[in-house]
Design a protein with these regions (language model features):
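Accessory alpha-helical DNA-binding modules that contact the DNA backbone or grooves
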Residues: 29-150
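Double-stranded DNA-binding cores of transcription factors and transposases
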Residues: 3-39
Length: 150
């Protein structure tokens, strides 16, 4: 598993934990490791093979164990279990530029939006969006249009 793949998994874990309302320190730990991986040039598989995971800035014991699991098995049970707690649609919302965990949570919990199609319908209507202004609506509208273009 590449550094980029691990980074993306940890980024999604942090987002899902935020949606879930988890401990902010736990979320911050994952985001710190994500930032570390953005600048880390050494392949994590190499570090694992040499028992040097402690060189990853910000990685505590729990995160190092998760990295080891990903490197050795190619997947992470914790991640799979966490993903299963949320419908696919909410994860799709997180993939839209301009929609972070707080916005996705508001759309999902306040407006029961569970898919990109439902989001697009609401964005293009006159329905008020919870805790969002017209600028956010326009940014999301643009991001959805760009996603359609491919």
């Amino acid at each position: 598993m590449t550094n980029q793949e691990i980074r993306e998994i940890f980024r999604e874990i942090a987002d899902l934990l935020e949606l879930k309302g988890e401990n902010p320190y736990k979320i911050r730990a994952y985001r710190t490791v994500v930032r570390s991986f953005e600048e880390f040039a050494v392949p994590v598989s190499e570090l694992h093979a040499q028992n040097r995971l402690n060189e990853i800035p910000g990685a505590g014991e729990a995160i190092k164990a998760k990295i080891a699991e990903m490197v050795t098995t190619g997947h992470l049970k914790y991640y799979e279990k966490l993903r299963a707690e949320f419908p696919e649609g909410i994860r799709e919302l997180l993939a839209v530029s301009g929609i972070g965990p707080k916005t996705a949570h508001a759309l999902y919990s306040d407006m029961d939006i569970k898919s990109l199609a439902e989001l697009e319908e609401v964005i293009n209507s006159d329905k008020p969006l919870p805790r969002m202004g017209e600028k956010t609506r326009e940014n999301i509208r643009r991001a959805l249009a760009e996603r359609k273009k491919g």
